[in-house]
């Protein structure tokens, strides 16, 4: 999962509760890459107070790897629930419920100064037979209101401001909040796929 790690399923032997464990490799990373990992963990931790953000439970640091223990969502991501399982097809009430949860999570993140920058169905996890959606993967998140980062995120869900051509990039900045708002509209379109 992601550029720096893989995700495993683990079960707490004392409580029998399943968790997802994201293993972030530290070996061979440049300082800049390690800084990105630390930022991802920090911002996810701050945002996980919201019920529609995947809870970050614990961080365990080893010499070669950082293990991030997060809430386990066995139903997978929104993308597979839409495209493979057809869970939302023709169910306007379920679509509305799910989309409002995503909006609420993103608005909460914005209210505490976090901008996700990679909103897409693959980064929204689903529980409760599709009734609950939770924002995940803060690998590209930032606290910068305006950023000069263009082209970060996933191409199919990228706002026009983030996908500008090279000569446009030199002349203007990209408002992080507005990019997330445009992408929310694209997420809504995915429900009708």
Question: Where are each of the predicted segments found?
Answer:
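A conserved loop-to-beta-strand element in the N-lobe of protein kinase catalytic cores
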Residues: 54, 63-71, 79-80
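AlphaC helix of the protein kinase catalytic domain
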Residues: 79-89
């Amino acid at each position: 999962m992601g550029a720096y790690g893989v995700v495993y399923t683990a079960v707490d032997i004392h409580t029998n509760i399943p968790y997802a464990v994201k293993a972030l490799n530290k070996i061979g990373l440049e300082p800049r890459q390690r800084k990105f990992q630390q930022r991802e963990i920090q911002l996810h931790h701050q945002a996980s107070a919201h019920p529609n953000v995947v809870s970050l439970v614990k961080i365990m640091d080893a010499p070669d790897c950082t293990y991030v223990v997060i809430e386990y969502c066995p139903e997978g991501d929104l993308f597979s629930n839409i495209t493979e399982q057809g869970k939302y097809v023709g169910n306007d009430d379920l679509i509305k419920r799910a989309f409002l949860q995503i909006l609420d999570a993103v608005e909460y993140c914005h209210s505490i100064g976090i901008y996700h920058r990679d909103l897409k169905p693959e980064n929204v996890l689903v529980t409760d037979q599709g009734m609950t959606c939770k924002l995940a993967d803060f690998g590209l998140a930032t606290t910068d209101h305006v950023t000069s980062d263009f082209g970060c995120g996933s191409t199919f869900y990228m706002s026009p401001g983030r996908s500008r051509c090279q000569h446009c990039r030199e002349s203007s900045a990209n408002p992080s909040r507005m990019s997330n708002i445009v992408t929310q509209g694209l997420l809504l379109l995915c429900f009708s796929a």
